[in-house]
Amino acid sequence: DIAVIGDCQTNLLGAGFHKAAIDIVDELVELRDFSTEVEDDTEYYEHRDFERMRSEHFYRWLNAIVELCCERLKENCSMSAICWDCNKYMPRGIEGTVVSSFGRICPEHLVERIKDEGIERLASEFFMWNNEERDALFYRNTALSALWEDCYFMPSARSEEDMEINSFIIENLEKAAA
């Protein structure tokens, strides 16, 4: 017997990424026709209802993250980043803000945005892949995340690494604009 064991943390990237991960599981099953056991906290694997998964799991999770940030800042607790790879550089802390993959944010501002615009609008900017398909927002958010997390803001001629990340950012921005 062949056993394939995998784990995928999808909260940081969004509902579209979660769906893509489940699609890969489906393709593996089709290729090899073996039995599967999938544990899916979002219940998407069982129900295949994208909107339900996105609103009941991902939007609730984002709301909880925003509330946690606000609570921690009110308690004067140190919280410099959310959803940030701890193996990457950490931008300098600025009081009242936290760093995320889409920039430096003020949690109170996010609460106001949720009240004024709804969680959906914030989610479309926060999650790299919030929609079912790789759409313009996916490419925009991918570019902005790379710009914030990986870019040295140096000319491509400086190094191979600079050329690769700069090209990646430009390529994704062009796809977003197309």
Language model: regions and residue ranges:
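Acidic (Asp/Glu-rich) sequence patches and key acidic residues
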Residues: 1-178
